[in-house]
Amino acid sequence: MYTKNEEELQSLGERLGYLLEKNDVLILTGELGAGKTTFTKGLAKGLQITQMIKSPTYTIVREYEGRLPLYHLDVYRIEGDADSIDLDEFLFGGGVTVIEWGNLLGDALPDTYLELEILKEEDGRRLHFQAKGSRAEKLLEELQHGV
């Protein structure tokens, strides 16, 4: 998938947000400034969250209320020490969990999640989705085919 600008990236996030269910997990990867938080802003809109979405870089976790709670984590600063936060509280907290830099968690990742790698390109963003587990596969299918 490819998006030409921030508006398209947010719009795709919003489409995914409409499809999300309780305990869905999304892992976002990409270099600094790739658009991870921008994508999450759209996703939050799809979850009917009206609060301003900010990067959790320095706070590690931000929580928002909408159709489902959104737990927005940035684990870059915990340097692979998943034990420094109670991941289970978010992963099984009845909401949607978005983890920026989630690939750094290694074995601490849940069994099922949808991963999105955002790559900067000159005129936009190249998006690579990878589904792990049947729920994530279904979610990706719905996102790609508008089911």
Spans of features found by a protein language model:
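P-loop (Walker A) phosphate-binding loop of NTP-binding proteins
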Residues: 31
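Short phosphate-coordinating micro-motif centered on Lys-Gly-acidic
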Residues: 45, 89-147
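Hydrophobic anchor at the beta1->P-loop junction of P-loop NTPases
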Residues: 26-28
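N-terminal pre-Walker A segment at the start of P-loop NTPase domains
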Residues: 1-15
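Conserved nucleotide-sensing/catalytic segment adjacent to the nucleotide-binding pocket
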Residues: 63-103
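Short beta-strand-centered segment that lines the nucleotide-binding/catalytic pocket of NTP-utilizing
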Residues: 49-64
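Conserved lysine of the Walker
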Residues: 36
